[in-house]
Amino acid sequence: MARSRFDTGSGPSQRQLRVGELIRRTLSSVLNQGDIHDPDLNRMSITVGEVRTSPDLKVATAYVLPLGGHGAQDALDALRRNRHELRRAVSKELTLKFSPELRFQIDETFDRMDETRRLLSQDHVRQDLDKPDED
Protein backbone atom coordinates (compact mmCIF):
# COMPACT_ATOMS: atom_id res chain seq x y z
CA MET A 1 0.00 0.00 0.00
CA ALA A 2 1.40 3.38 -0.97
CA ARG A 3 1.82 5.98 1.75
CA SER A 4 0.63 9.52 1.30
CA ARG A 5 3.33 12.10 0.77
CA PHE A 6 1.77 14.11 3.60
CA ASP A 7 1.89 11.22 6.09
CA THR A 8 4.84 11.53 8.45
CA GLY A 9 4.08 8.20 10.12
CA SER A 10 4.06 9.64 13.63
CA GLY A 11 0.87 10.13 15.54
CA PRO A 12 -2.74 9.66 14.51
CA SER A 13 -4.01 10.75 11.10
CA GLN A 14 -6.47 13.61 10.66
CA ARG A 15 -9.22 11.08 9.99
CA GLN A 16 -8.45 9.21 13.23
CA LEU A 17 -8.58 12.48 15.16
CA ARG A 18 -11.83 13.56 13.49
CA VAL A 19 -13.57 10.20 14.02
CA GLY A 20 -12.30 10.03 17.61
CA GLU A 21 -13.77 13.44 18.35
CA LEU A 22 -17.11 12.49 16.76
CA ILE A 23 -17.25 9.31 18.87
CA ARG A 24 -16.34 11.31 22.00
CA ARG A 25 -19.15 13.79 21.41
CA THR A 26 -21.65 11.03 20.67
CA LEU A 27 -20.68 9.00 23.76
CA SER A 28 -20.92 12.12 25.93
CA SER A 29 -24.35 12.90 24.54
CA VAL A 30 -25.64 9.34 25.03
CA LEU A 31 -24.32 9.19 28.60
CA ASN A 32 -25.76 12.62 29.49
CA GLN A 33 -29.19 11.81 28.09
CA GLY A 34 -29.38 8.52 29.99
CA ASP A 35 -30.35 6.53 26.89
CA ILE A 36 -28.74 3.35 28.24
CA HIS A 37 -31.01 0.90 30.08
CA ASP A 38 -28.75 0.48 33.10
CA PRO A 39 -29.77 2.34 36.28
CA ASP A 40 -26.22 2.15 37.67
CA LEU A 41 -24.80 3.87 34.59
CA ASN A 42 -27.60 6.44 34.42
CA ARG A 43 -26.94 7.49 38.03
CA MET A 44 -23.31 8.34 37.26
CA SER A 45 -22.05 11.51 35.68
CA ILE A 46 -19.19 10.42 33.42
CA THR A 47 -16.77 12.65 31.53
CA VAL A 48 -15.38 11.37 28.24
CA GLY A 49 -12.03 13.12 27.97
CA GLU A 50 -10.65 11.63 24.77
CA VAL A 51 -11.28 8.85 22.28
CA ARG A 52 -8.37 7.32 20.37
CA THR A 53 -9.05 5.15 17.35
CA SER A 54 -6.93 2.47 15.73
CA PRO A 55 -5.58 3.26 12.24
CA ASP A 56 -8.28 1.08 10.63
CA LEU A 57 -10.99 2.78 12.79
CA LYS A 58 -12.28 -0.59 14.01
CA VAL A 59 -11.30 -0.07 17.66
CA ALA A 60 -11.99 3.07 19.68
CA THR A 61 -10.58 3.51 23.19
CA ALA A 62 -12.50 6.03 25.29
CA TYR A 63 -10.73 7.63 28.24
CA VAL A 64 -13.37 8.30 30.88
CA LEU A 65 -13.57 9.61 34.42
CA PRO A 66 -16.61 9.95 36.69
CA LEU A 67 -17.34 13.45 37.89
CA GLY A 68 -15.36 14.04 41.06
CA GLY A 69 -13.06 11.12 40.31
CA HIS A 70 -14.76 8.85 42.87
CA GLY A 71 -16.06 5.43 41.86
CA ALA A 72 -13.85 5.18 38.78
CA GLN A 73 -13.76 1.39 38.82
CA ASP A 74 -17.55 1.15 39.22
CA ALA A 75 -18.00 3.50 36.26
CA LEU A 76 -15.55 1.49 34.18
CA ASP A 77 -17.35 -1.76 35.03
CA ALA A 78 -20.74 -0.24 34.11
CA LEU A 79 -19.42 1.06 30.79
CA ARG A 80 -17.85 -2.28 29.95
CA ARG A 81 -21.10 -4.07 30.83
CA ASN A 82 -23.02 -1.80 28.45
CA ARG A 83 -20.43 -1.49 25.67
CA HIS A 84 -22.63 -3.27 23.11
CA GLU A 85 -25.54 -0.91 23.70
CA LEU A 86 -23.18 2.08 23.61
CA ARG A 87 -21.69 0.77 20.35
CA ARG A 88 -25.18 0.56 18.82
CA ALA A 89 -25.94 4.11 19.96
CA VAL A 90 -22.70 5.41 18.43
CA SER A 91 -23.28 3.57 15.14
CA LYS A 92 -26.81 5.01 14.93
CA GLU A 93 -25.43 8.55 15.15
CA LEU A 94 -22.33 8.18 12.96
CA THR A 95 -22.07 7.05 9.37
CA LEU A 96 -19.02 4.83 9.29
CA LYS A 97 -18.28 1.73 7.25
CA PHE A 98 -17.66 -0.23 10.46
CA SER A 99 -19.00 0.40 13.92
CA PRO A 100 -15.88 0.55 16.09
CA GLU A 101 -15.43 -1.80 19.03
CA LEU A 102 -15.53 0.37 22.15
CA ARG A 103 -12.96 -0.04 24.89
CA PHE A 104 -12.86 2.00 28.07
CA GLN A 105 -9.90 3.19 30.15
CA ILE A 106 -9.64 5.49 33.16
CA ASP A 107 -8.49 8.97 32.09
CA GLU A 108 -5.32 9.73 34.04
CA THR A 109 -4.61 13.07 32.35
CA PHE A 110 -5.51 15.12 35.41
CA ASP A 111 -3.36 12.96 37.68
CA ARG A 112 -0.39 13.40 35.33
CA MET A 113 -0.94 17.17 35.20
CA ASP A 114 -1.03 17.36 39.01
CA GLU A 115 2.18 15.33 39.23
CA THR A 116 3.89 17.59 36.67
CA ARG A 117 2.83 20.70 38.60
CA ARG A 118 4.11 19.15 41.82
CA LEU A 119 7.47 18.35 40.25
CA LEU A 120 7.81 21.83 38.73
CA SER A 121 7.03 23.49 42.06
CA GLN A 122 9.89 21.77 43.90
CA ASP A 123 12.60 24.20 45.07
CA HIS A 124 15.55 22.66 43.21
CA VAL A 125 13.56 22.53 39.96
CA ARG A 126 12.19 26.05 40.41
CA GLN A 127 15.69 27.51 40.87
CA ASP A 128 16.79 25.87 37.60
CA LEU A 129 13.76 27.26 35.81
CA ASP A 130 14.30 30.76 37.21
CA LYS A 131 17.96 30.96 36.11
CA PRO A 132 18.57 33.49 33.33
CA ASP A 133 19.76 32.07 30.02
CA GLU A 134 23.50 32.29 29.49
CA ASP A 135 23.30 32.66 25.70
From Swiss-Prot:
Q: Which UniProt keywords apply?
A: Cytoplasm, Ribosome biogenesis
Pfam families, sorted: RBFA
Subcellular location(s): the record lists:
Cytoplasm
One Gene Ontology MF term: ribosomal small subunit binding
What InterPro entries is this protein classified in? KH_dom-like_a/b (IPR015946), RbfA (IPR000238), RbfA_dom_sf (IPR023799), Ribosome-bd_factorA_CS (IPR020053)
- Recorded superkingdom: Bacteria
GO cellular component labels: cytosol
GO biological process entries: maturation of SSU-rRNA
Q: What is its main location?
A: cytoplasm
Q: Which SUPFAM superfamilies match?
A: Ribosome-binding factor A, RbfA
Q: Its family?
A: Belongs to the RbfA family.
Q: Which NCBIfam families match?
A: PRK00521.2-5 (NF001802)
- Spell out the protein name for this chain: Ribosome-binding factor A
What gene does this protein come from?
rbfA
